[in-house]
Amino acid sequence: MQHIKEQYQQISTILSFALIPLSGFATDIYIPSLPSMASHLQVSSSAVQLTLVLFMVSAGISQLFVGSLLDSFGRYRLGIAALAAFTLSSAVIALSGSIYMIYAMRIVQGISVALIVVGKRAYFMDRFSGDTLKNYTSLFSIIWATAPIIAPFIGGYLQSSFGWASNFYFLGLLTLVIGLLELKYGGESLGQFQPFKFKPIIQVYQSMLKTTDFTLALVIISLCYAMLLVFGMTSPFIIEHVFHYSPVAAGYSSLLSGVALMIGGIISKSMIRKSLTKKITVAISLQLAFAISMIITAGYYSSLYTMIPFVLAIHLVAGFVFNNLFSYCLGRFSKNAGIASGITGGLMYVMASFFSYGLVDMVNIKSQAMLGVAYLVLVTLILIFFILFYRARYAATSLQWSRS
């Protein structure tokens, strides 16, 4: 088995960082191309939006279990196989004229990305420790957040210059190059292989999901992420078909949306010592005000320049709420931090996909007003689940005090 050579350690680390945002790139890069795909494949907008959902659901479910596979069979061989599968499936999508073939390949890509990303996160745990490990892991969220910023920007230009298939050629070429570099400079990072045990994993997951405050926090962050997905699924059709702007403009809009989400996360870190209940209550109140104002404004005038400011404000607050409660979920089970991370990331993808696609399917989002209605529905659900979360958290804290 090929192991990482000491002189290639730095290159392996750079390659690992390069693959962490792959899940975001695999969805966000072709968001500006959704209208073109629907037209070329002669299918409805919801049919091409389903390609996003299938990818995220397969990636989310896979994240729940691939950690144990990687611990049992190693990171390197599974990672190389996943990169090869992703590259080939990207080529098939680009060449395919069938939406059903694209569906199948997106599921393959979701599973592949789960193996790649989880394996690369584990690489850092295998190779580093102490302050070095802390420094590297602190960069994960920042690097992951680059995808919704950079990918739509690239995708908009690819769509305008070469068409929708070029996005998948780009993804395939990217993973092919990284895969070849992995073959030359990479290697197995796992020191000790573990036997694969399925039943104990399920038991731990069941125990976590029975913890009410954890599960409710997980639902809330899924609703926050669903806001970004709803915008990603619908904004290209509004911007390109209703406002008559180019795919490049749709790409820039998604870029700004990603920046707003990142700023919200940064603000949350600066307020880490503030009361969780107070700051989330204020944040949800602001989101309600922004969503209602977005709907009212659309009754008088609607354009790209009236829609995007409201979107950015809502997404900034969503990033704030998301970061606070995502941290809460990860810290809720300190003794099983790895499993908590897997279940939080995996189920968040699955639930956010169902929330967003279900809402897009029920609400015909073809205007600023209807996008505002979709946001209002999501914020109202966040408010309801946060009230339930507050009560569950208070009950759990009271129980701990009574036992002590």
Functional labels for PLM-detected ranges:
Residues A85, S89-V92, Y100-V108, Y305-A313:
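Paired small-residue
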